[in-house]
């Protein structure tokens, strides 16, 4: 990254550190499958593992050469001292049905190391899938999967359920009537999952057989605090200082939800057994370029039982550049009226279908109703008989890869690719003794 910063400064020495950071964001792309990846309220894809992705040096230099320096940074801070208890054992499996006994209506659970139900899942019917050691043949769309621990890893069980269409998984122990464990090796599981005791699981499975209308939901019992913000800014960094007294601070999950609905995980379940967090400062970039005005929600969940804590104080600091934004969409009203003639656009939308959100167009000072998509294709040799075709794509578009070997022959379709981002690629075997020609055809949205 430091080398890329040097390249940017080489073509535009007037760039500030904020300019360089935003250039890195604007030129980045996601290259790894990660279920945590979401588009934030400004349309920028982000996950908690690699942030906005890997910057493209060529695009960064191109953007830097015509970059408009950012306005001065403004910081708005908000403080509160709620002094409230953090509910113990906040991970709960909710069970509803006319035959559900009271002790099974709100079951204490443990969880994975990956995706969490920061918002409650849908209340769904469940399918008892037994131990699950191979792919699930039935369609679980619109359902949750009830699975017993054993033989296969947690990660494989959850993946099989996700492949079958399940929205979430409940895994119950196969040994020890009351034990709850954290499900290791599940950092990249594609759907949320809870773990419950053998006693609760065995009883639920029998109840499911008697009551086909039974429904379940993954939820969290958290302490929540709301900050109402009236300042209109384009968001950059966000800082949250948390002052809490908890016996094992690693049990706490701390999240921040922006007015756009984007959730940042500031702290996840871990093995830190110290007290706190005592006046810890957490920062997130997940909300870059979102509007700041509206409701910001802090949630703190105790994800393990038996230890209790108190939330004493919070301080939220929003950093960004002020704009006039009466409709709170992250687009400056004068810019929006100039290009759209009204205030009916949104920052998340891609009005000209060129792969760039209106918020990105505003950042780069390009026209949001005129496509800026420039098709480029690169041919990258991987070894002596394998090539990678890579091209600038539009998200969601389907591309045909055409190939022609030698001269005077009819080109044939080698395959199709549906793009999920601003770049797509295709690997191909070639004969190094023959000439080969390739063409990419954009077939548009399916």
Range-by-range predicted roles:
Residues 1-50, 54, 157-183:
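Hydrolase catalytic cores
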Residues 323-446:
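Short, composition-biased motifs enriched in small/polar/acidic residues
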Residues 4, 24, 51, 145, ...:
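Residue-level detector of buried hydrophobic side-chain packing
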Residues 9, 14, 28-32, 150-152, ...:
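Acidic glycine-/aspartate-rich tracts in secreted/extracellular proteins
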Residues 67-82, 221-231, 372-394:
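Surface beta-strand/loop "capping" patches
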Residues 51-84, 352-374:
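Catalytic cores of secreted or luminal carbohydrate-active enzymes
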């Amino acid at each position: 990254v430091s080398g890329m910063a040097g390249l940017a400064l080489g073509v535009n020495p007037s760039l500030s550190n904020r300019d360089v950071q935003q250039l890195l964001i604007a030129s980045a792309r996601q290259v790894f499958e990660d279920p945590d990846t979401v588009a934030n309220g400004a349309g920028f894809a982000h996950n908690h593992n690699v942030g906005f992705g890997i910057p493209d040096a060529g695009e960064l230099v191109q953007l830097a050469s015509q970059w408009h320096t950012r306005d001065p940074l403004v910081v708005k801070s908000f403080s509160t001292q709620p002094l409230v208890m953090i509910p113990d054992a906040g991970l709960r499996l909710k069970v509803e049905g006319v035959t559900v006994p009271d002790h099974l209506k709100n079951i204490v659970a443990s969880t994975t190391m990956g995706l969490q139900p920061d918002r409650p899942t849908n209340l769904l019917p469940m399918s008892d899938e037994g131990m699950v050691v191979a792919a699930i043949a039935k369609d679980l769309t619109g359902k949750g999967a009830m699975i017993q621990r054993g033989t296969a890893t947690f990660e494989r069980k959850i993946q099989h359920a996700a492949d079958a269409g399940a929205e979430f998984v409940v895994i119950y122990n196969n040994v020890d009537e009351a034990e709850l464990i954290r499900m290791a090796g599940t950092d990249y599981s594609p759907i949320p999952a809870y773990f419950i005791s053998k006693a609760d699981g065995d009883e639920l499975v029998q109840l499911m057989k008697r009551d086909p209308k039974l429904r379940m939901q993954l939820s969290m019992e958290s302490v929540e605090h709301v900050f109402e913000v009236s300042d209109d800014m384009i968001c950059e960094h966000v800082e949250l200082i948390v002052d809490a007294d908890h016996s094992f601070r690693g049990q706490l999950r701390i999240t921040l939800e922006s007015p756009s609905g984007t959730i940042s995980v500031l702290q996840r379940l871990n093995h830190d057994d110290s007290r706190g967090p005592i006046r810890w400062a957490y920062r997130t970039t997940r909300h870059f370029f979102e509007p700041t005005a509206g409701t910001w929600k802090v949630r703190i969940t105790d994800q393990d039982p038996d230890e209790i804590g108190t939330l004493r104080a919070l301080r939220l600091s929003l950093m960004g550049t002020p704009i006039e934004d009466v409709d709170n969409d992250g687009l400056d009203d004068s810019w929006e009226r100039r290009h759209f003639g009204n205030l009916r656009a949104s920052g998340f939308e891609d009005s000209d279908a060129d792969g760039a959100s209106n918020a990105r167009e505003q950042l780069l000072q390009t026209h949001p109703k005129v496509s800026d998509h420039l098709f480029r294709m690169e041919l990258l040799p991987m070894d002596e008989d394998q090539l990678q075709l890579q091209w600038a794509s539009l998200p969601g578009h389907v591309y045909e890869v055409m190939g022609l070997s030698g001269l005077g022959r009819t080109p044939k379709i080698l395959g199709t690719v549906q793009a999920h981002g601003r770049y797509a690629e295709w690997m191909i075997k070639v004969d190094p003794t023959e000439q080969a020609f390739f063409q990419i055809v954009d077939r548009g949205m399916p």
